[in-house]
């Protein structure tokens, strides 16, 4: 029998405070445990199949914020999709995102995958970006954006596919 943890029940023992390991529950809480920069081990998050909104997402997105230990967000197989939420990075470095489809993003940021500010050494590759929920502006009928990068350096976007997007790749 194969038992897999879900995005909301997966656990990891990580050094959150510098006083030893604590158990974090859920994908977002595990990522948040890296924010205080006490944990130095790299983290690989692997997803399989259709992933709907995790229970704890800031503003409707999976958020990588102030992480420097190195995180890989990886889809396993040919059908991994983040359905109904996006992935946002802020103030982070050494992040890899690969082999994930993004669709129906309905978060407050509005981007399937957004590098919002002060990121460096980020690689987004072999991903599929589909349209999101309509935004408030006339040019946002199919969502705000698919893959947006703002005030970030040493970023590579490679071998990605954009499907029926109104806006697809902002660099600013």
Question: What is the role of each PLM region?
Answer:
Residues 1-6:
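Conserved small/polar residues in nucleotide/adenosyl-binding loops
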Residues 7-11, 20:
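Short polar catalytic/cofactor-binding loops
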Residues 20-41, 53-72, 80-98, 104-120, ...:
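Extracellular beta-strand-rich solenoid/capping regions of secreted or surface-exposed proteins
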Residues 43-45, 152:
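Generic beta-sheet signal
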Residues 46-49, 72:
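Acidic, glycine-rich low-complexity segments
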Residues 69-79, 93-104, 119-134, 145-146, ...:
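Right-handed parallel beta-helix
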